[in-house]
């Protein structure tokens, strides 16, 4: 399904332009992110906290889940379930971001960027919720 087909399907369901933009953003975020789990596996595994066993496996599994979730939000029948899955996955990877803040010397990322990542994570959670769970028909205009 291409972007135009997705837009047409969503418009038939009377989704707001804002929610459509949110869905597109969430799709791109997780689709690109999921691919990066396979293209940069070692880099991704390096941010997994040491208490998580088999970091490479964790990265690969989360990459598959990101790709499945991204594809799932495109389909009206699976959108809500995929949104819940992406929401939970986003919560599940938050300890990696906290670990990076606790040990910034291990990573080649400015500390300010590590701090910025936390509110971005919250905004992403809100966007996932709003664009996948709260789809409401537009009110008819008089």
Language-model regions, residue ranges each:
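Membrane-interface extramembranous regions
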Residues: 2-142
């Amino acid at each position: 399904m291409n972007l135009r087909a997705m837009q047409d399907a969503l418009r038939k369901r009377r989704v707001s332009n804002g929610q459509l933009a949110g869905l597109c953003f969430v799709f791109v975020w997780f689709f690109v992110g999921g691919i990066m789990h396979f293209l940069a596996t070692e880099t991704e595994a390096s941010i997994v906290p040491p208490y998580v066993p088999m970091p490479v496996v964790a990265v690969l599994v989360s990459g598959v889940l990101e790709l499945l979730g991204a594809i799932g939000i495109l389909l009206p029948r699976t959108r809500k379930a995929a949104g819940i899955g992406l929401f939970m996955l986003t919560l599940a990877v938050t300890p990696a971001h906290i670990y990076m803040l606790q040990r910034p010397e291990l990573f080649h990322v400015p500390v300010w960027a590590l701090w910025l990542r936390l509110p971005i994570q919250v905004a992403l959670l809100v966007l996932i919720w709003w664009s996948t769970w709260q789809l409401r028909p537009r009110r008819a205009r008089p």
